[in-house]
Amino acid sequence: MQKLPAHPEVKENLGRLREAGVRLAALTNSTQQLADAQIDSSGLREYFDQVLSADTVRRLKPAPEPYRMAAENLGVEVGQVRLVAAHAWDVTGAMQAGCSAALVARPSMVLNPLFERPDVVGGDLREVADGILEAEK
């Protein structure tokens, strides 16, 4: 798991979000050491202001504490955070913690019909970035 490559459209669209003034942080259930290794091996470190581990608060996502910790580390209210994830459970956890959310709905990823739908859903990060930039207007 330490050397997973990013999907082809990821770098370009993280760059688009940064250029538009969106602050980016990575939040993972991995340990900080593994999170740092993953972000470095993927070549994505330059796009993120922070790389955060849920391990810091000793509660894993989808518990609310990791999302709240991310907001605190960014110096914003939890309602100002938008989690972008490829897993419906992560999106649901973020929304239940008070965040906005976006789902990268790659093939086989589906939303849980029992939970609220995030305001941005796209088939890849390009579509999600388009939706975020439109929502931020």
Where are these regions (language model features)?
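Asp-based, Mg2+/Mn2+-dependent phosphohydrolase catalytic module
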Residues: 15-18, 31-32, 36-137
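Short, acidic loop-to-helix structural element flanking the phosphoryl-transfer center
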Residues: 1-26, 36
